[in-house]
Amino acid sequence: MKCRLIATGERAPSWVAQGFAEYQKRLSHWMPLELVEIEPGMRGKGRDAQRATDDEGRRVLAALPKNAYVVALDVPGRPLSSEQLAQRMEHWRGQGRDLAFLIGGPEGHAAEVLKSASESWSIGPLTLPHMLVRLIVAEQLYRAAAMLANHPYHRA
C-alpha cells in the first residue's frame, strides 16, 4: 500500500519539510509516503475565493492516484484517535488500495473534492496552519503504522 499526501499551499518552511521528511523516512518500510504540493489559487483584493478553491480542486483531483481510497482532511470530518486511525489503516490495507490524504487550501476543499472522497477525517477543532497539518498527518500515519507493527513508538 502506498500513500500520497496531496496538500494545497505554498512550499513548507524548512523546519516543516525536515519534520515531514523524517516521518516519511520512518514510514518507508511500512508504507511509502509521497507528498504532492498543489499550488494555491490566486487570492487577494478583487479576486473570487470560490474560483480559486474550485481551481485548486481541479488540480487536486488530477493528482489523485487511480483507484485510491481518498481521505479528505476537513473540520466537520470524523475525528479519530490514534488508535482509531490505526484500526482504519488496517482496514484500508485489507482493501489492497493505495491511499490519498487531501489537505485543502485556505477556504478548504472544493465541493467536487469532497464528493470524490471516500471519507473525511478531522484532526480536531483547532485552526492550524496548513503547513503544520502536513507534519501532523505524517506523524499520525507513522504512529498508526508503528502500532500495527507492535513497534514501541506509541506509548499511550
From Swiss-Prot:
<comment type="function">
    <text>Specifically methylates the pseudouridine at position 1915 (m3Psi1915) in 23S rRNA.</text>
</comment>
<dbReference type="GO" id="GO:0070038">
    <property type="term" value="F:rRNA (pseudouridine-N3-)-methyltransferase activity"/>
</dbReference>
<keyword id="KW-0489">Methyltransferase</keyword>
<feature type="binding site">
    <location>
        <position position="73"/>
    </location>
    <ligand>
        <name>S-adenosyl-L-methionine</name>
    </ligand>
</feature>
<keyword id="KW-0808">Transferase</keyword>
<protein>
    <recommendedName>
        <fullName>Ribosomal RNA large subunit methyltransferase H</fullName>
        <ecNumber>2.1.1.177</ecNumber>
    </recommendedName>
</protein>
<feature type="binding site">
    <location>
        <position position="104"/>
    </location>
    <ligand>
        <name>S-adenosyl-L-methionine</name>
    </ligand>
</feature>
<keyword id="KW-0949">S-adenosyl-L-methionine</keyword>
<feature type="binding site">
    <location>
        <begin position="123"/>
        <end position="128"/>
    </location>
    <ligand>
        <name>S-adenosyl-L-methionine</name>
    </ligand>
</feature>
<keyword id="KW-0963">Cytoplasm</keyword>
<dbReference type="InterPro" id="IPR029026">
    <property type="entry name" value="tRNA_m1G_MTases_N"/>
</dbReference>
<dbReference type="Pfam" id="PF02590">
    <property type="entry name" value="SPOUT_MTase"/>
</dbReference>
<dbReference type="InterPro" id="IPR003742">
    <property type="entry name" value="RlmH-like"/>
</dbReference>
<dbReference type="GO" id="GO:0005737">
    <property type="term" value="C:cytoplasm"/>
</dbReference>
<dbReference type="InterPro" id="IPR029028">
    <property type="entry name" value="Alpha/beta_knot_MTases"/>
</dbReference>
<keyword id="KW-0698">rRNA processing</keyword>
<comment type="similarity">
    <text>Belongs to the RNA methyltransferase RlmH family.</text>
</comment>
<comment type="subunit">
    <text>Homodimer.</text>
</comment>
